[in-house]
Amino acid sequence: MDKLRIAAYGGFRWIPPKAGAAGSDKFAFELYPRIVKRGHTLVAYCRIYPGDTDFQISEFEGITLKYYKTHSKAGLDTLVHSAQATFDVIFNNTADVVHLHSGANSIWVILLRMAGKKVVLSQFAMDWKREKWPWYGKLFYKVSNYITAYLPNKVAFDNVYTKEYFEKKFRRTYNFIPYGSEVKIPPSNIDILNKIGLQKDEYFLFVGRFIPDKGLHLLVEAFEKLKTDKKLVLIGGSPNPSEYEMKIKKTTDNRIIFPGYVYGDDTNILIQNAFSYIQPSLIEGLSPIILTVMALGTPLICSDIIENIFITKSNAIHFVSGDINSLNEKLRYALNNKEAILSKAKIGKTDVSERFNWENITDQYIDLLKK
């Protein structure tokens, strides 16, 4: 099988990413155009949420885009959408090989394999540990692990720790393929800084979803205790209406600002001009935003979970995960040791560019999809 016919769905919501997008969207945005450029065909199944009025394009950089309506409730949206995509693949024969995202979608492997489709599943993290899921959601993930472990033709993990967990529990061998770190160097204009009212090096930054896993409640409280004139800029929001987001935005500290969603070059410009980027995650897979921050050479403060340590090594400032006082201490350290954090960032930029290369990652995925 030289040229592949591939269908992809399950984790990403849209290609290209838009408001509410997450790491899986970035992953698909970087990987799939590269696969198509190597001569393969790929159908990506995107989501339409209630009230979504955006114009739906049918093609992006050679990728065929198909759309299905889904539910707005977190978790249920993936289930409903993936069911429709699965039946389209089977009954309309849109692909020979299916690339599924997330073990939550492993239930569809059964039908796909029965229909003669090859399935490669990408597992990004220990999702059953995420605080955003109720007990029944966590139970669903734990049960799905057994299907993930045995039924796909191949399974790829983006971090070695989840891979090791599965290998130890299920006594099987799996594949490790990380995210890439390359980013387009943003233009030198600072229009986005002017729009938000920022100056270079005068703000800390976070970009991502406002969900408990990301630890924003810890960051807000730690920053509120910090004596500085610098601002804390929290870019993003919740993919669905969220009490957690409302709680975060109740802060009375006027140094903390919420510009909403920002994408593309503007995001990278904000990262590149920040005094430091902060990633307070309680749980992660291999974090795309950390890779982006390090590739741009911006000083990084992040939680000491093993997935973050794997990427950053000693090239970031680490605080004890879940510990507000530890985070506050590291914020104070950064303010008083600018040259030290810049030195770490410079070394980290070189390191991630060598270890996390999108072209090599694309080659690995194509090899896996062909097996």
Regions found by a protein language model. Name each.
Residues E245-D265:
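Nucleotide-activated donor-binding/catalytic signature segment of Leloir-type glycosyltransferases, i.e.
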Residues R47-P50, S181, V207, K231-M246, ...:
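Glycosyltransferase donor-sugar binding loop
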Residues D77-F91, A95-F124, W128:
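An aromatic- and histidine-rich active-site surface loop
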Residues L31, F87, M114, K138-V155:
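Membrane-proximal helix-turn-helix segments that form the acceptor-binding/catalytic region
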Residues L282:
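Aromatic "clamp/platform" in nucleotide-sugar-dependent glycosyltransferases that forms part
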Residues P299-C302:
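Short hydrophobic beta-strand element within catalytic cores of glycosyltransferases
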Residues I317-N325, Y333-E339:
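Conserved acidic donor-binding segment of nucleotide-sugar-dependent glycosyltransferases
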Residues K26, F206, I211-K225:
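A conserved mid-protein helix/loop that constitutes part of the nucleotide-sugar donor-binding site
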